[in-house]
Swiss-Prot record:
Parts forming coiled coils: 55-98, 170-272
Protein name stated in the entry: SH3 domain-binding protein 5-like
Organism the protein comes from: Xenopus tropicalis
Compositional bias annotation for Polar residues: 34-45
GO terms of molecular function: guanyl-nucleotide exchange factor activity
Primary role: Functions as a guanine nucleotide exchange factor (GEF) for rab11a.
Keyword list, A-Z: Coiled coil, Guanine-nucleotide releasing factor
Biased composition regions of type Basic and acidic residues, renumbered to the chain: 344-358
Span list, region Disordered: 1-53, 276-305, 344-373
Length: 373
């Protein structure tokens, strides 16, 4: 008895797990989301740290800024003091001129008649100072001449110590000492002549003072208050003038320090700019040899992080493994697969079951699966 022919066994069975959308294992999906969030947080923290490091000032900048502030404060203070000193000098000069003019009006012509005497006294005082300086130079020249002669004597003793042999070292020393003696002798003669000259001038100036003092004694006594006041005022003016000159030099030095600090700051700024430029160039590294950038990444853009790519590959492999495990119960599956996921042949499931001698015909079925590389 023949059995009824059943329907065709060519039935496409759905791949287990294909009906579900989303990740096959929820744990892997959650792990992927957590890892992605962790990567983003780490990237954001790294960017924040990098910006914080870049924003951190170079300690040299703080030092130079402190020096700049100190120099600026010093310049302001010195300029104020300089203005005050100049104002005081002008005030004293005006007051001195007013007082001297008033006193000259009271004394009359005796001031002009006694002026040669005070001028001779001034020249005599300068001659005395020149004489003192010339005397010091002459004494120093005499000492140098005596030391040079002593050196010549020592060198001569060394040369004549060994009569059988002439030592070139002692000979050179003797020549050098002889030159020093000649130079010292010339300096001594020149200093002696200068000292005699200024001494003679000093004597002449003192003699002239004595002569004028005798001839202009009455006018000298009458005009003495004027010239004494003038001498006092000149001393005060010289002190203020020296203070003004000193403050001007201090201001100039402070401005030099200020400009030097500005140059240092400019140099530090250039170094920081060059270092940041070099860091930005080093951060844009090329991919390793053999690695291919994803097609979606354009030139000048950065692709996804390496950890994200590894996580996506892990999810794909896990999905394929689950698909392979879910069809282990299927029998007689073909082992020939293609890269695009299509089977090269159909599987016939004509396994017949014989019950009580009857011959049953089973239907063939196919199963499609894909292999991910």
């Amino acid at each position: 008895m023949e059995g009824k022919e059943g329907p065709s066994c060519e039935v496409r069975l759905p791949t287990p797990g294909a009906e579900r959308e989303g990740p096959i294992h929820p744990e892997l999906g959650a792990f992927g989301e957590t890892a992605s969030n962790t990567i983003k947080l780490s990237e954001s923290s790294n960017d924040g740290k990098k910006e914080e490091i870049e924003e951190e000032l170079d300690p040299r900048i703080q030092e130079e800024l402190e020096r700049l502030n100190q120099a600026s404060e010093e310049i302001n203070l010195l300029e104020l003091q300089l203005d005050e000193a100049r104002t005081a000098y002008r005030r004293i000069l005006t007051e001195s001129a007013r007082r001297l003019n008033g006193l000259a009006t009271q004394l009359g012509a005796c001031i002009d008649k006694a002026r040669p005497y005070y001028e001779a006294r001034r020249l005599a005082k300068e001659a005395q100072q020149d004489t003192h300086s010339a005397a010091l130079r002459y004494e120093r020249a005499v000492s140098m001449h005596a030391a040079a002669r002593e050196m010549v004597f020592v060198a001569e003793q060394g040369v004549t110590a060994d009569k059988n042999r002439l030592d070139p070292t002692w000979q050179e020393m003797l020549n050098h000492a002889t030159c020093k003696v000649n130079e010292a002798e010339e300096e001594r003669l020149r200093s002696e002549f200068e000292h005699q000259r200024v001494t003679r001038q000093c004597h002449e100036a003192e003699a002239k003072v004595q002569t004028l003092q005798k001839s202009l004694k009455r006018f000298i006594i009458k005009s003495r208050p004027y010239f004494e006041l003038k001498s006092q005022l000149n001393t005060i003016l010289e002190e203020h003038k020296s203070r003004v000159t000193s403050l001007e030099n201090s201001v100039a030095q402070a401005k030099l320090r200020y400009s030097g600090t500005l140059r240092n700051l400019e140099q530090i700024s250039e170094e920081i700019h060059a270092r940041r430029t070099q860091s930005s160039l080093l951060s844009q590294r090329a991919p390793p040899l053999g690695a291919e950038a994803p097609p979606s990444v354009k030139d000048g853009e950065t692709g996804p992080p390496a950890d994200t790519v590894s996580l996506l590959s892990l999810q794909t492999i896990a999905s394929d493994l689950q698909k392979s495990d879910s069809v282990e119960h299927l029998r007689d599956l073909t082992d020939v697969t293609s890269l695009d996921g299509r089977e090269t042949g159909a599987v016939e499931c004509g396994g017949s079951r014989e019950r009580g001698g009857d011959r049953g015909t089973g239907g063939a079925f196919r199963h499609h699966r894909s292999v991910s590389l």
